[in-house]
């Protein structure tokens, strides 16, 4: 019986670590900036990678059943603007197409920052990506440390973390 209870507790803690946080339009709508990004497949978020995104604006509507993201990517140092609309699925994750199928949700909110977890599925397989965006264009040591802990929860090595502020030259 004790083993069963310990297993149930471990499963509950594991699920709680990957829960979807609810957001409201007042928390989301407006200008945002990408601060950090990381992925279990680092090439996807390295300079020139298809999932290295520079977020500029977020908006949710219909009680956050849809989530619109305006962002840029860079191809050969040329900024390309994109706008995607994620629709909330029954599991609470938003679904959209960009460089494959994407399933994303907010995993942390704090100090004018939000952290997203995204699962990108394309022809090469599945990639776990985490991204932290902020209302400001800089980040603190504490924010980076929180991001490192979040990366660890998703089995993304610290060395796969990319600081985006210094490489964001789009729409300035």
Swiss-Prot record:
Q: Which InterPro entries match?
A: Calycin, Lipocalin, Lipocalin_CS, Lipocln_cytosolic_FA-bd_dom, OBP-like
Task: Output the Gene Ontology terms for molecular function.
Answer: odorant binding; small molecule binding
Would the keyword Metal-binding be found if you checked this record's keyword annotation? Answer: no
Cysteine pairs forming cystine bridges in this chain are: 60-64, 79-170
Carbohydrate-modified residues: 41
Q: Where in the cell is it found?
A: Secreted; Cytoplasm
User: Could you state what the record's PTM comment says about this protein?
Assistant: N-glycosylated.
Q: Which UniProt keywords apply?
A: Allergen, Cytoplasm, Disulfide bond, Glycoprotein, Secreted, Signal
Any idea what this protein is called? Male-specific submandibular salivary gland protein
- Which organism's genome codes for this protein? Mesocricetus auratus (Golden hamster)
